[in-house]
Amino acid sequence: MDDQKGPLPPYTPTATAPPPASMRQRRPPGRRRALRRSRTVRVLALACLAFVVLAQWKQLWRGERKAPPYLSVDKLNDNLETCRKLRVRPQDPAGPGRSKNDRYLDGGGKPTLIRNALIWTGEPVPGTSDEDARAGVGWAWWLGDVLVERGLITKVDNKMPASEVPEDAIIYDAEGRRLTSGIVDMHSHAGVSPLPGLNGNDDTNEASDNITPWARSIDGLFPLDPQIQVIKSGGVTSSLILPGSANNIGGEAFLIKHAVGRHDGRPELSAASMLADPDRTWRYMKMACGENAKRVHGSRTTRPVTRMGESYDFRRAFERASQLVRRQDDWCDRAGEVGVGSMDEYLPEDLEWEALGAALRGQVHVNAHCYTVNDLEAMVDHSNEFEFPIRAFHHAHQAHLVPEILNRTWGGRPPALAIFADNMYYKAEAYIGTPSAGKMLYDQGLTPIYVSDNPVLNAQHVVLEAAKGFHYGLPYHAALASVTTAPADTLGMGQRLGKIKAGFDADIVVWDSDPLGVGAAPVQVWIDGTAQFDDPVVLSKPHARAEKDTVVVPDAPPPVVVEEPVEVADVLFRGVTRVLLDEHDVSAEDGASLNVAIRGGRISCIGECADEFRVAIDAGVGVVTLGNGHLHKTFVGVGGTLGLNEIDGESKTGNGKNPKTFTRAVDGLLLGGKKLRAAHHAGVTRAISAPRFKGGGNTHHGTSVGIVTSARTSLDAGAIFGNGDVAVHYTLDLSVRGGDDESYSAAFGSLREKLIRAGVHGGKEKEVGAEEVGAEEEEEEEEKAFLRRVLASEMVLALTINSADGIATALRIKDEVDKKQQKQQQQQQQQQQQQHGTSSGIRMAIIGGAEAYLVAEHLAAANVGVILSPLQSYGETWDARRALPGAPLTNGTNIDRLLDAGVKVGIGLKEDWEVRDLALAAGTAYENGGGRLTGRQALDLVGRNVLEILGVEEEEETPGATMGESGHFVVLLIINMFCGL
């Protein structure tokens, strides 16, 4: 101890050493113990005092300490508020109980009473169990009124008492028409991929990187995109506007309503004013698996080249976002513990990863574009590894094969499936699929949703996808839910959108017929209670089924969906209600049906056929009983690449392109594939296809070939009709403008020159012994030989053109060449006249024809037929921008104007997958034609007319070969509400 040590003695040379310890003076033992206790007490006292002082000082320091001078206290407090938001998982915004729509403007539109409507509420009748409801019990249309106030549906009743209707209410009489909520399209690119497509306007994909969670579709949304209004005319009131699928993570999507500017009831013209939920309760993100990212980004120096690279990019992105989430959580935890004044840095924020971090927090509904089993499984694995839910898989062609994988998705809620009804075969990922997927998914307890992927499909007709789903077996209520309540719920808006119910947004559609029927169109659309069309065109539908009951139970789906058709030579049919054939045009009396006997591939009896049935049954012939069968000629698929291509996006599976070379389709046939089986299944027993020019499948260059779709190879008996070469095809649409040095004038000028040169040398054949020519000269001579046949009226010149200007130029060239030919014929010698005959002029056909109605009278005067491919163009390209959208925007469509002018019209294919829908196209023309067409005339649009326009003579339809002798007719099961033919 210090007090026991005296000072050192001064140094002196004479000083003696200290005495030994044994001789030193000792204190008494008691004294030493007392000193020790004293010192211990003093040390403890000092320690306690020090502790108290330190504690007081720390308390004082904490209360008075300020953040470092380089940090803003206001921002730190904002950061703390952000912490609170980061840890809140959104709840679906409430609907019922609101006093007004969140989008409603004070002083907005007047109340509206919609009277006398056949209402589909989107819910089964009260008291229906969930099990019964899913099975289709408790659903019905019922007659009633809907009151709309302050942007909301405020009351739905069988008959609204006058006392409950505001005095200033607008009264709209629905006249017994069907009323539903607005259609919700959960996959659209409207506004970011404006039409017509121009490079300067396209903002679909931010392809600068493969991982772009920071991209936002709203920043590219163009409110003046014309298709926003066209889509609305199909009853679509809300759309999820997604970035494209070029990137594995494409960015944020936004849910909009199709009301634009003051005319539509909005306060301003802006993307922000179109948001369906101004509070942005939920956020949405687009991700994409598979082929697209590999194709767009993959190379030797950039990922992904394979799906392995894609998974790494996904996982690395999720890891980085997870790191941001952890850093934020750590900051928030510490700030909550010690106070923001103790923080020496702001909350970690990173704009690049903020949205993806929010997805990992469950604040973003992830929408993943994934087609295949391996892509679906990989994405589900990612969701479990990084613990985030997936709200929906889009496209998902193979999802019906793997419900177990889907049910393993993290979070306990399996994703919904946003699908097409029958759009497939366009790339390898879409090669495995079935139009029955909607039914199969529903039966597996999953949620099918039909979408447009606009402009891939015209979202104006997205409800037709649901109708096709119903046709392929999805229950009626589930089919209608697939474009109303199901997408609304999946988007987190199930308390505001998708139902006709008090408290829901007043997004309402009144239809001219059953919305799941062919050709259904709105007569009026309301968004937030504001009527969207001042003077809507209402179609006259003499064939529509009138409803007399106040409660209508929806039709059942077809009882059997046959995956593969059966070819038989002998069969008996019961339950046929309509026969539409050249020699037979018979309809059964109301409530009755017809029997049809077919023996040896030919119809032997129509009617009661008692004797024929007895003899045939005794001989073991099978009997097929139908509910509402129609017997008619089969269909012809024209305009696509049927028989020349199997997977559109995979060049190895097709004949290839012919931008420079004139070829014959008969030399490139590839039969026996899925497309042709699908065609045959749909009653399309014949197809006429030309070699592809370039670009899409609806460009043509060379001679077309006629094939029977059930043939396995071109050597099968009767596999080819039309003598091997049907028509001579050239493409003169926008695809001829492929380079800076290519022009319309050059393309049309080249055709004129070829025709004139063929006519000048029309009578001369190659002389025996003449000098051999090279391959290029041979090809030119072959092309010239076919053009001579065109000039001699032996073959049709089929031109693929959409623009009215292009069609006008083609008609001028035809007139010019015809006059030259007439003059030359007058000067020819008798020998030449006998050899080639006298031409009556070029027989021309137009394929495509999106703007043909603008020159309808000229087409009729020139006797030029038009094969509309498709029936109703969407105006996707500049040369088709004047296409007519139809009711309620325009009085009639292209086909109506052409028929009125006397033009012979057929319906063809824009893409091969449409081959299943030719009957629907004919039905649409029939239902929406205002009585212009009989049932048989409508069917001729996809049969006889096509053959006549392309010059296939009647005797060529049924060649003498075995396959042809069977006759081309088909028996289809038709649901009354689905097709009025």
Swiss-Prot record:
Broad enzyme group: hydrolase
Sequence positions that bind Zn(2+): H187, H189
Enzyme Commission number(s) of this protein: 3.5.4.-
Alphabetically ordered keywords of this record: Glycoprotein, Hydrolase, Iron, Manganese, Membrane, Metal-binding, Transmembrane, Transmembrane helix, Zinc
Region feature Disordered, mapped onto this chain: 1-36, 86-107, 819-838
Superkingdom per UniProt: Eukaryota
Cofactor entry: Fe(2+); Mn(2+); Zn(2+)
Membrane topology: Single-pass membrane protein
TM helices/strands, residue ranges: 40-57
Subcellular localization, as worded in the UniProt entry: Membrane
Annotated Fe(2+) binding sites: H187, H189
Gene Ontology CC terms, in alphabetical order: membrane
Comp. bias regions, Low complexity: 823-835
Molecular function as annotated in GO: metal ion binding; N-acetylglucosamine-6-phosphate deacetylase activity
Ranges of Pro residues composition bias in the record: 7-21
Compositional bias (Basic residues): 24-36
Glycosylation site positions: N407, N891
GO terms of biological process kind: N-acetylglucosamine catabolic process
Pfam families tied to this protein: Amidohydro_1
The protein's role, per its UniProt record: Amidohydrolase; part of the gene cluster that mediates the biosynthesis of the tetramic acids Sch210971 and Sch210972, potential anti-HIV fungal natural product that contain a decalin core. The PKS module of tasS together with the enoylreductase tasC catalyze the formation of the polyketide unit which is then conjugated to 4-hydroxyl-4-methyl glutamate (HMG) by the condensation domain of the tasS NRPS module.
PANTHER family named in the record: N-ACETYLGLUCOSAMINE-6-PHOSPHATE DEACETYLASE (PTHR11113:SF14)
Similarity annotation: Belongs to the metallo-dependent hydrolases superfamily.
Protein name, UniProt field: Amidohydrolase tasK
